Amino acid sequence: MPELPEVETVRRGLQPAMEGFRIDRAVAHRENLRFPLQKDFAARLTGQTVTGLGRRAKYLLADLSSGDVLLMHLGMSGSFRVIGADGETTPGEFHYPRSEDRTHDHVVFEMASGARVVFNDPRRFGFMKVFPRSEIETEPHLKGLGPEPLGNAFDASLLAKACAGKQTSLKAALLDQRVVAGLGNIYVCEALFRAHLSPKRKASTLANRKEEPTDHAVRLTEAIREVLGEAIKAGGSSLRDHRQTSGELGYFQHAFKVYDREGKPCPTCGGTVQRFVQNGRSTFWCPKCQK
């Protein structure tokens, strides 16, 4: 599933074709993706101008001139193609080639920019929903999300308070979208390595008794920002189905220090990168470097 950097890369790729332009026609080729599409889905989009294209955690949010918001989630295999006069691009191109089967082109936006924006999703774990912007604070998919890790509000103090008293593992806490939004398995493994912190460490060790940040929290906050920033610059790194809107692959996977490197030497100490299953997910780490 795409994580924050991949979704941000897709957002940036879609902006030139969508932001500031009217949706001349919206077409849904099926009644449902992961969830049923609203019966008035296409009607609420057709004729509306996309006044802004943002992101919250792993969700894309298109502000519409009607006062509605179009929420989009890529799911496991969803991708967008932008078809214009200059050819076809795929924002947020990911590792594996996208599906060439056009029967999985489920939603199409015909833009006043002259572009056609096509959502293709073979597995149909992605979804879309239109709702009034006035309900954004209560929208179930967005309600309760933690701070954006690249936002100004996210710092060591905030992370420490969120983890204070938590007896869960540090990795489990970071994957909790209520603690910090948008992080997934790849970037949690990489950030913990850069911060020299064990994924098995208790989350509570990020705070002292006064719920003030420890040095661990400071290092981890810096590592999270660093790894996400580098991944966005590289165009993302999700491993299976996801790709950039430009049709090019994301290259941050070539900079992985531990993720998917089981049995290979640690780039810091020369020890062996190990893998173990933690809460049903593979965790990659260096036991010598991460304490």
Swiss-Prot record:
Catalytic activity: Hydrolysis of DNA containing ring-opened 7-methylguanine residues, releasing 2,6-diamino-4-hydroxy-5-(N-methyl)formamidopyrimidine; 2'-deoxyribonucleotide-(2'-deoxyribose 5'-phosphate)-2'-deoxyribonucleotide-DNA = a 3'-end 2'-deoxyribonucleotide-(2,3-dehydro-2,3-deoxyribose 5'-phosphate)-DNA + a 5'-end 5'-phospho-2'-deoxyribonucleoside-DNA + H(+)
Coiled-coil stretches noted in the UniProt entry, renumbered to this chain: none
Cofactors (names): Zn(2+)
Active site: 2 (schiff-base intermediate with dna), 3 (proton donor), 58 (proton donor), 281 (proton donor)
Keywords: DNA damage, DNA repair, DNA-binding, Glycosidase, Hydrolase, Lyase, Metal-binding, Multifunctional enzyme, Zinc, Zinc-finger
Assigned EC number: 3.2.2.23, 4.2.99.18
Binding residues for DNA: 104, 123, 166
Cofactor binding note from Swiss-Prot or TrEMBL: Binds 1 zinc ion per subunit.
Keyword ATP-binding included in the entry's annotation: no
GO MF, any single term: class I DNA-(apurinic or apyrimidinic site) endonuclease activity
Pfam families: Fapy_DNA_glyco (PF01149), H2TH (PF06831), zf-FPG_IleRS (PF06827)
Listed Gene3D superfamilies: 1.10.8.50, MutM-like, N-terminal
GO annotation, biological process: base-excision repair
Zinc finger region(s), FPG-type: 257-291
Described purpose of this protein according to its UniProt entry: Involved in base excision repair of DNA damaged by oxidation or by mutagenic agents. Acts as a DNA glycosylase that recognizes and removes damaged bases. Has a preference for oxidized purines, such as 7,8-dihydro-8-oxoguanine (8-oxoG). Has AP (apurinic/apyrimidinic) lyase activity and introduces nicks in the DNA strand. Cleaves the DNA backbone by beta-delta elimination to generate a single-strand break at the site of the removed base with both 3'- and 5'-phosphates.
Family assignment from sequence similarity: Belongs to the FPG family.
Subunit description: Monomer.
Protein name: Formamidopyrimidine-DNA glycosylase
Upper classification of the organism: Bacteria, Pseudomonadati, Pseudomonadota, Alphaproteobacteria, Hyphomicrobiales
Gene that this polypeptide is encoded by: mutM
